[in-house]
Amino acid sequence: MPEMYDVIAKVISQEGECSAGHRVGDEFLVGQTTPIGMCSWAFCALFPFATALQSGGSFPWEDDEDSTTVACPDPQNPLVFELTRQGID
């Protein structure tokens, strides 16, 4: 089985108050299950993008092939996460 890249999800912007208590600067190592302490709604929104980055994929609309941004689905208190692929050790 090919190795998978690590992906870090970092909160880079916030409007309103997150019901899960997330704040700008929070970081999570994304795996195949919801990281401890991460809102499950946010995880469900970013999981498909994180999976693509983990397997070496990229997004044609991004300038950096190792990252993308994803918003959580809360329309009244949105957070934006930056997903960044890390190197394989």
Which stretches of residues belong to each language-model region?
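Short, compact, well-ordered microdomains
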Residues: 3, 60-89
